[in-house]
């Protein structure tokens, strides 16, 4: 499974570490990552992939949304195919 993950929220120490640790726990590989800070607002976009026989998209989504809620961040995940289709419009 290939997916795009976005993380947005108020800047705080350890955002990248929290997200990377959760992805590692889920056995999700970070293929590419980009982040920036805009007036104390943190934004990050990740390209990720994993074996969907081991972890469903729904389970990955639930785990990342839970992390987002606990960390006061908005974390969204989209299937790469959906993201690609949206970009073509």
From Swiss-Prot:
Cystine links in this protein are none
Residue ranges of every copy of the ACT domain listed in the record:
4-78
The record's annotation in InterPro entries points to: ACT-like_dom_sf, ACT_dom, UPF0237/GcvR_regulator, UPF0237_ACT
Q: Which family does it belong to?
A: Belongs to the UPF0237 family.
Note the NCBIfam families from the entry.
Answer: PRK00194.1 (NF001220)
What is the official name of this protein in its record?
UPF0237 protein lp_2508
């Amino acid at each position: 499974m290939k997916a795009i993950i976005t993380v947005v929220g108020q800047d705080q120490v350890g955002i990248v570490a929290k997200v990377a640790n959760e992805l590692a726990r889920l056995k999700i590989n970070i293929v590419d990552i980009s982040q920036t800070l805009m007036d104390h607002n943190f934004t990050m976009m990740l390209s990720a992939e994993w074996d969907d026989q081991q972890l469903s998209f729904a389970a990955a989504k639930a785990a990342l949304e839970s992390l987002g809620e606990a960390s006061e961040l908005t974390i969204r995940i989209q299937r790469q195919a959906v993201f690609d289709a949206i970009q073509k419009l």
